[in-house]
């Protein structure tokens, strides 16, 4: 097979779930429902975090950023998936594919860094409660949020730039969107150890944050065990447990997809794993934080109560 022409006229075919035509309608209905729930849930968290004064804290400031990321993250792939499931045109231009890879990696990398920042916030709240307001100053919170976005986009820029320099053979992507591991399956040859450099970039943005978060929660667990008050323990476990569950969902799927060798990556399995972290996880995050968090539930019931009275 010859080297694929990656000029502006080149393009790709997204196979998606065309291998299971009988399931496409079922996929379409369920994904549309999940996407609608994701939009509502994450938008609600952003709105509550901004309007309720009780939620004007570092924790909810970062949570609103996470919700905005999840909105962008799922919107970068799901609308195209719905179009592909509903219609016959499964093509995407080379420029559109590269843009999708860049945006998806940028948002995912930003979320990876932001989850570390949120773990640091929980560490400061539990392990340094007397100095929490001094440590998590609004200026520092803004700086950490900006650093998360800048770091995520820089990492994506490096990986996407390296990917574009590699020769491709073929134009058929066995996926429902342009994702890095599937893209690498089309690489004809690795010149100059580019794949190794890309793996290092992925490891930096996935493995390093994972280790930092595990270290933070080891310190948090040690501090919680020293607390004598049962109420204080439950409160710490509630706020930290929500974040830890989100972390497990995010990094579990990220490690499976991005840190395994190219030769052992299964495109068929990868599609279903991708459904999990592009649709299911962004949908579950608002539910996890609202159902396990008294402040967020209180703010939500307050808004619903006003709506009932007004109605």
UniProtKB/Swiss-Prot annotation:
Q: Where is the signal peptide?
A: none
Tell me a GO biological process for this protein: sensory perception of smell
- What name goes with this protein? Olfactory receptor 2Y1B
Annotated glycosylation sites: 5
Topology: which residues are Extracellular? 1-25, 79-99, 155-197, 257-270
The record lists the organism as Mus musculus (Mouse)
Q: Where in the cell is it found?
A: Cell membrane
Listed as disulfide-bonded, the cysteine pairs are 97-188
Where does the source fall among the domains of life?
Eukaryota
Q: Which GO terms describe its cellular component?
A: membrane; plasma membrane
PANTHER family referenced in this protein's UniProt entry, alphabetically: OLFACTORY RECEPTOR
Q: Which Pfam families match?
A: 7tm_4 (PF13853)
Q: Supply the alphabetized keyword list.
A: Cell membrane, Disulfide bond, G-protein coupled receptor, Glycoprotein, Membrane, Olfaction, Receptor, Sensory transduction, Transducer, Transmembrane, Transmembrane helix
Family listed: Belongs to the G-protein coupled receptor 1 family.
Taxonomic lineage from the root? Eukaryota, Metazoa, Chordata, Craniata, Vertebrata
């Amino acid at each position: 097979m010859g080297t694929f022409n990656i000029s502006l006229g080149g393009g790709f075919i997204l196979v998606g779930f065309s291998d299971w035509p009988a399931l496409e309608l079922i996929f379409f209905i369920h994904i549309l429902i999940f996407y609608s729930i994701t939009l509502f849930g994450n938008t609600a968290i952003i709105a509550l975090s901004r309007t309720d004064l009780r939620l004007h804290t570092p924790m909810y400031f970062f949570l609103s950023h996470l919700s905005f990321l999840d909105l962008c993250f799922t919107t970068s792939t799901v609308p195209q998936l719905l179009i592909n499931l509903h219609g016959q045109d499964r093509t995407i231009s080379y420029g559109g594919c590269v843009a999708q890879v860049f945006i998806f990696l940028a948002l995912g990398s930003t979320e990876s860094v932001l989850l570390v920042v949120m773990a640091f916030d929980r560490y400061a709240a539990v392990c340094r409660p007397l100095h929490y307001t001094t440590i998590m100053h609004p200026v520092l919170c803004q700086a950490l949020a900006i650093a998360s976005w800048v770091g995520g986009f820089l990492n994506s820029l490096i990986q996407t730039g390296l990917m574009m320099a590699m020769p491709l053979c073929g134009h058929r992507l066995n996926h429902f969107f342009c994702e890095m591991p599937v893209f690498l399956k089309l690489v004809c040859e690795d010149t100059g150890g580019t794949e190794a450099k890309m793996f290092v970039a992925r490891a930096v943005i996935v493995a390093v944050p994972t280790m930092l978060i595990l270290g933070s929660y080891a310190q948090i667990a040690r501090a919680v065990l020293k607390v004598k008050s049962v109420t204080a323990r439950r409160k710490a476990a509630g706020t930290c447990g929500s974040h830890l569950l989100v972390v497990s969902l995010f990094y579990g799927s990220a490690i499976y997809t991005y840190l395994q060798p190219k030769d052992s990556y299964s495109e068929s399995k990868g599609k279903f794993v991708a459904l999990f972290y592009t649709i299911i996880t962004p949908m579950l995050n608002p539910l996890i934080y609202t159902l396990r968090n008294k402040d967020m539930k209180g703010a939500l019931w307050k808004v619903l109560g006003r709506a009932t009275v007004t109605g």
